[in-house]
Regions:
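Short coil-to-beta strand junction motifs in C2/discoidin
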Residues: 164-185
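Short connector loops at helix/strand junctions that flank enzyme active sites
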Residues: 98, 119, 148-150, 180-182
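Short catalytic/ligand-binding loop motif for oxyanion handling, primarily in non-cytosolic enzymes
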Residues: 10-11, 158-164, 249-252
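Conserved long hydrophobic alpha-helices within structured protein cores
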Residues: 142-161, 196-202
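Terminal, low-complexity interaction segments
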Residues: 180-272
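N-terminal targeting leaders for non-cytosolic proteins
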Residues: 1-133
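Extracellular and analogous surface-interaction loops
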Residues: 124-149, 170-171, 231-236
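Extracellular beta-strand-rich recognition modules
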Residues: 2, 150-157, 239-247
Length: 272
């Protein structure tokens, strides 16, 4: 769980001003939370993505939450359905087993990631105590991969995503119910080079499409509360898991539904 996370790597407010260089006041979260798994030599890391800023002059590489990644949070504002509340979970008690949880943000599709690198997805790394970090400026982060089996994780919708699915906003085509739409999170196993292994686990966060009732386990509803997801389908030897999203409400520029989910209580068996 995330109950022992130091305050220095947690979201400072429900927006997460300290997740961005311009508003962090010198206390920006970058490499994120990393913690040892039991008494093993394997650590699990939840960083913010370090990527090229394609639309910024000079195209520098920077840690910024808009690149995708994780925000460790304990905020649970249930009424504000916009990006200023992106670090809130739609659950009155915060996390699943305690107050804290992680918000995964970002997605990969043919528009923003034509090479299927999953570079804009939040990624969970199994690694050593050093973790994945910048070794050479303006190049992808590097680290030592460790391996294990991801058994399960608990997930919950964020307030922002839940309320946009429920009510729509200026970016969507209305509520998901009016569209008879759907939205799901996709856990993708990656190898040590960052390439997908071909193993994925899908979990629907909302469904109003009758043709997907059976596969989603949902009929005309948005998922509420914390729910456990079986991740064993990712395989027995995984070093990195990308968290991606797919949905029916999309345009030529990608998803219209906010690409967030809260996670907690990840169960991993390390290969040592």
């Amino acid at each position: 769980d995330f109950d022992n996370v130091p305050s220095s790597v947690m979201a400072s407010d429900q927006y997460g001003n300290n997740l961005y260089s311009a508003t962090a006041n010198g206390k920006q979260v970058t490499t994120g939370y990393i913690t040892q798994i039991g008494q093993t030599g394997t650590y699990i890391q939840f960083p913010i993505n370090y990527l090229e800023q394609e639309w910024v002059s000079g195209q520098p590489w920077e840690y910024e939450f808009w690149n995708g990644g994780f925000a460790i949070s304990n905020f649970h504002n249930l009424t504000q359905g916009d990006y200023q509340n992106q670090c809130s979970v739609y659950w009155p008690n915060g996390g699943h087993s305690g107050k804290n949880f992680a918000v995964a943000f970002g997605y990969s599709d043919s528009y923003n990631d034509s090479q299927a690198t999953y570079d804009k997805c939040a990624k969970i790394y199994l690694t050593d105590a050093t973790g994945y970090r910048v070794v050479t400026t303006n190049t992808p982060v590097k680290g030592t991969p460790k391996y294990g089996k991801f058994n399960s994780v608990w997930v919950c919708n964020t307030t922002y995503t839940y309320l946009v699915m429920k009510d729509g906003n200026s970016f969507t085509q209305g509520s998901l119910s009016a569209q008879k739409g759907w939205f799901k999170v996709v856990f993708v196993a990656l190898d040590a080079t960052g390439k997908p292994t071909g193993k994925e686990v899908e979990y629907y966060l909302a469904n109003f499409d009758s043709s997907k009732d059976a596969e989603s386990g949902l009929t005309n509803k948005i998922r509420t509360g914390w729910n456990q997801v079986d991740l064993s389908g990712l395989g027995d030897s995984v070093c990195t898991v990308a968290i991606n999203f797919e949905g029916s409400d999309s345009s030529a520029y990608g998803l219209n539904t906010p690409a967030y989910v809260a996670i907690d209580d990840i169960d991993v068996t390390v290969n040592e």
